[in-house]
Curated annotation (Swiss-Prot):
One of its GO terms (molecular function) is structural constituent of ribosome. GO terms for cellular component: cytosolic small ribosomal subunit; nucleolus; small-subunit processome. Residues 242-255 have a biased composition (Basic and acidic residues). This is Small ribosomal subunit protein eS1. Its main location: cytoplasm. Signal peptide: none annotated. GO terms for biological process: ribosomal small subunit biogenesis; translation.
Length: 264
């Protein structure tokens, strides 16, 4: 066996040398996430995306990004069992403009409502809004004791359950079909649809804890920047002329344009 040093290791080549550690955050930028004008608190927070490099544009990585936010954070409220999903539809400068993408109840709220000695009634329906959004709404309700009832249980008969389910579907269809997405979201925030169902079903069987527990977005119309700007109210309206011009420029080159302006 030949005695001597291994030339490959002593040169400081592949095996001996350490790789240079590059901080991944040095190539990323922070963008503000803006909620539509239906909500009291418009600034949701920030999101990270890799900077524009060559053909890979930063705004393309942000479009379609979904944020799940508690209604308590959107309305500055203490009731925090409703969660809204907001999807990024356009990027204006350093702002991500979002739109409604769905709603859900928290797991702990759903579990707290399901109890013994009562009937749980569920219904779901697919409805189209006036502006072309196809939504699937899920509703849930629970029977409760009548006034002066001595019996421990409050079970509804199968026929009553069917009547209540029919009523739920009718009210959900009516409330969504006659309104656009903005008005539907305004009804989901205080859950006025659930309260209407509770009132309408009193004559069939008394109900409590009636909620639209989930809303799914099934289909959307073709994206229009003007409509998204309307949803974002004052911010969108004020920046509308500039928004149409700068929106396209920012998408093409995030880090290239400012230095050119300075030199001019």
């Amino acid at each position: 066996m030949a005695v001597g040093k291994n030339k490959r290791l002593t040169k400081g080549g592949k095996k001996g040398a350490k790789k240079k550690i590059v901080d991944p955050f040095s190539k990323k930028d922070w963008y503000d996430v803006k909620a539509p004008a239906m909500f009291n608190i418009r600034n949701l927070g920030k999101t990270l995306v890799t900077r524009t490099q060559g053909t890979k544009i930063a705004s393309d990585g942000l479009k379609g990004r979904v944020f799940e936010v508690s209604l308590a954070d959107l309305q500055n409220d203490e009731v925090a069992f409703r969660k809204f999903k907001l999807i990024t539809e356009d990027v204006q400068g350093k702002n991500c403009l979002t739109n409604f993408h769905g709603m859900d109840l928290t797991r702990d709220k759903m579990c707290s409502m399901v109890k013994k000695w009562q009937t749980m009634i569920e219904a779901h329906v697919d409805v189209k809004t006036t502006d072309g959004y196809l939504l699937r709404l899920f509703c849930v309700g629970f029977t409760k004791k009548r006034n002066n009832q001595i019996r421990k249980t409050s079970y509804a008969q199968h026929q009553q359950v069917r009547q209540i389910r029919k009523k739920m579907m009718e009210i959900m269809t009516r409330e969504v079909q006659t309104n656009d997405l903005k008005e539907v979201v305004n009804k989901l925030i205080p859950d006025s649809i659930g309260k209407d169902i509770e009132k309408a079903c009193q004559s069939i069987y008394p109900l409590h804890d009636v909620y639209v527990r989930k809303v799914k977005m099934l289909k959307k119309p073709k994206f229009e920047l003007g409509k998204l700007m309307e949803l974002h109210g004052e911010g969108g309206g004020a920046g509308k002329p500039a928004g149409d011009e700068t929106g396209a420029k920012v998408e093409r080159a995030d880090g290239y344009e400012p230095p050119v302006q300075e030199s001019v």
